[in-house]
Amino acid sequence: MTDKVRIYDIAREMGRDSRDVLEVCEQLGIPFKTHSSTISPEQAELVRSKLGAPHIVKPPRPRPKPPSESLPPEPPAEAKVGERPQQKVPGTASAIVGIRRPAPAQQPAPVGEAKTAETLPAAKPSLSRPERVSPEKGSAGGAQLIGPPRRQVTPLVRSSEATQKPETVSQPATPPTPSESAAAKASGSEPSPVAKRPIVLSPPQRATSGTKPPAERPEPPQKAPEPSRPSPSEAPSPSHARVPQPAEEKAPSPPPAQRPRPQLVSAPVRPGTRSPATKEDSVSSGKAGEAPRPQRRMELVGPPTRPVAKPAPPEPDAASPLPERIPGERPSPVLVEAPVRPTPPKVKRKTEEEEDDELQALSRRAARVQAKRKRSRRRGEGDGDGLDLDPMTIISAVKQAELNALKPLARPTAKPPSYRPPAATAAPPARPRPAARLQQQPTSAEAGAADRASGTEPLPEEKVLLLDGSLTVQELAHRLRVAETEIIKTLFFKGVMVTINQVLDESLAESVAKELGYEIRRPKAEPEAKKTEMLDVEDIDHLVSRPPVVTIMGHVDHGKTTLLDAIRDTKVAQGEAGGITQRIGAYHVDVNFEGQKRRIVFLDTPGHQAFTAMRARGARVTDIAVLVVAADDGVQPQTLEAISHARAAQVPIIVAINKIDKPGSQPERIKQQLAEHGLLPEEWGGDTPMVEVSALTRRNLDALLEMILLVADVAELQANPNRPARGTVIEAHLDKARGPVATLLVQNGTLRVGDTLVAGAVLGRVKAMMDDRGQRLQEAGPSSAVQLLGLDEVPAAGDEFQVYTDEKEARRIAQERAEVLRQTRLQQALLSRRVSLGSVSAKAQEGQLKELNLIIKTDVQGSAEAIQTALRDLPQEEVQLRVLLAAPGEITETDVDLAAASDAIILGFNTTLAPGARQAADDKGVDVREYDIIYNLLDDLRAAMEGLLEPEEVEEPLGQAEVRLVIPIGRGAVAGSYVLSGKVQRNALVRVRRRGEVVYEGRLDSLKRFKDDVREVAAGFECGIGIDKFQSWQEGDIIEVYQMVTKRRTLASV
């Protein structure tokens, strides 16, 4: 393998990138795998000849590099050593300048040809190697390298540059050390390149160490006799250095020599004008090459920075055409940070409190100066004892330096913060704070500190607490603008132990707020059925008439669904469990009216009291409310609730008095009852249309439909079909075959297959749509009720949906809403374990409060909502209900696992069990109950809650006896008694009353009739009653006989 040559060795010898050599090998058909592959010497010669340079026999370690264009074949050896002395020799810097300018266009060949393009690709791989070689030898190599560069540079070198660089070269013995140390921090083995350019920066570094104030940059050069003069000029001359160094990268084609110089140049680049976003801008503006941070401090103070400006820098800036070529980023920050690091630790010993106090003192002092100046202007006094000065001038230089040091250290990406007078801004924001703390709301203590620092008194606030429900301790503290510990302490004195995240019920929060002097106000409750406006301003010019949406409302069993069946010629009511509607339905009906075919959309709502939310949802989206009242039953609670929903939604009401065909119906009585609740019939001079109908006999149905269309025409219902659809989710459920299915009511726009929509927090794409009769639709216009497939999850009934043209925006909105929903659920979970002063929390702490965990699975989302609403109405003083899961869909094995883990009961309402769920429930002992009527579900749930209640002992009276004769026996006495009522039993509990007062309570020990012991004596018989512990009988005493029995408690008795 010794006679073979590696591809990357050829690339290094030729000053080319390995990829160039690989391309040549590919062209010549030479097999290879990577740049580390070896080829024979004959193949190597072919490659070298193809690349256009003769082979120079050199071992790979020396890393021969062909110098610039006109050098003879020897330069590779000289190039190695030559890089080191370039710092010393006066002519090298000027020669480098000359080499750089031709370099970008040419690639120098190793022999002597004018090819400098090879240097550019080789610059990156050679950074580390030349740096190691250069520090060891500084002068010998320099003499050798001087010759070749001078020949090329002579036409391009300026006289000023030639004179300045000899001076800098003369210093390498001493100056290189600081520069090398600075560069060594950035790259451990890069001293030689750092020595070249830092030589230029070394005098400024001495100056920074010698003079603490950064503004006195010109002075340090004076300390050093020879180097100090060139150093200030060359402090801007980092730009000078930049020009030669890029040239040096290109002139020495071999990679090893080129990289150190770009890195050296990078150090001057930062002090120069290169980085606009860093604090080093001040150095680039013309000031000596000092560290940027001290300069920033002087800029903050203001006055000292002005004298520091120097006219010298423009010359080097003009001479630096190639600053962008400099790749070295690491050395530059090291050179800048080296002088800065020693200073901050001295000042940073102060704590944040001391910084606050100092800033506040300065702000107050500045405020006093401004106040005095204003008063002097008003009085016309012109004394200039510092009153005309800016508030910053009263700060001594020492204070300014301390204040500057208090500020956070400069970061390379951050802009230098401009100093503002402390009086103008609050003190806390000026201090560096952790980002996490800045995101939090300021505490009351911080707010007070800010007010004091700004010199302004906080305005007196009205101490009012808007209380809208249960709150956590943290939320209550924020609303009251007090510390959380204050709330916890107040509750502790009340005997309540809480943590910051615990939820306080409304009464407890109110008591805490009142104790802290706050007035309690409660927000005005908005009705559930408040209508949402779906039209936008842009729709006004494109409105067309739309069909009316009519909601059928009324009390249970008043014939709502039967009436709708009669209108639609269907038999929906016959298929309903228990003969009652338990879900909201949407239907279309086409009616011939005045020779035109008109469409009406009907929403059928449940009448049971548990389905309040469904009725409110129907009223919110409807245009007309049809109130069905049974003529034989009259106005009932849900009838009144429906009236309130319709009024809240501000929709017109049409009353349909149903069942007029039944005997005993009294339509006039119904009208009288409705008039008492504000619905006055039209024939009585009111504005409420009332139609007497019979659903079974189809009597007056046409009159009802005609009335609906007349009211709709008066309302002038309109929508814009030429826009993305908007509307409301009427109902939703999970179908095991089709997935999430939602019933949508399109209220504006047109919904099409393929649209992307967001319903509440659920994202989806319309895959298919069906109407109420199961026919597929491609689009649905305004006032259309459709079943939609394609949602990711089951949306909540009542959520509004909207179609978005941009899917990314829709996804973002859905994610934001989902996060809000998640927070709401967490709050609800906390509310289930709220703390109160009542008996509930006390019993819970004593372990007397029992919990019943439930998992509710229903056919549709609205049913789950209705069941949860009904559960909240049950008394929960001793048994609390915790709903772990309430969702539509079938009961799965996952639900069974959750129930087994949490000891919960699964309630299935109009749903089925998935395959395997029944077996899993039997194996794990989970109680799964299925219902199709909500009455039965609530009754069983109430019974289960009562079963968890501890049975109570109650007194059951047995009988009464009157003492007629006291019979003394031995030391005691026996009461000869007559049984007045009931019976008297031996060993029963007795209560002896004398003139209405109880004189003894105990147990009846002996009972005799004549001389025989008996177990009991019935009413109307005489007996002898003896009690061992009571002997003081008197005639006329009443003996009450009773027993204690355990009785099952009911929720009504709780």
From Swiss-Prot:
What Gene Ontology molecular-function terms does this entry list? GTP binding; GTPase activity; translation initiation factor activity
Q: Where is this region: G2?
A: 579-583
List the residue ranges of the region (G4): 658-661
Where is this chain's protein located in or outside the cell? Cytoplasm
Pfam families noted in UniProt: EF-G_D2 (PF22042), GTP_EFTU (PF00009), IF-2 (PF11987), IF2_N (PF04760)
Listed InterPro entries: EF-G-like_DII, IF2_II, IF2_N, P-loop_NTPase, Small_GTP-bd, T_Tr_GTP-bd_dom, TF_IF2_bacterial-like, TIF_IF2
Q: Fetch the PROSITE patterns from UniProt.
A: G_TR_2, IF2
| Annotated GTP binding sites | 554-561, 604-608, 658-661
Alphabetized, the UniProt keywords read:
Cytoplasm, GTP-binding, Initiation factor, Nucleotide-binding, Protein biosynthesis
Q: What family classification does the UniProt entry report for this protein? A: Belongs to the TRAFAC class translation factor GTPase superfamily. Classic translation factor GTPase family. IF-2 subfamily.
What is the name attached to this protein's record? Translation initiation factor IF-2
The encoding gene: infB
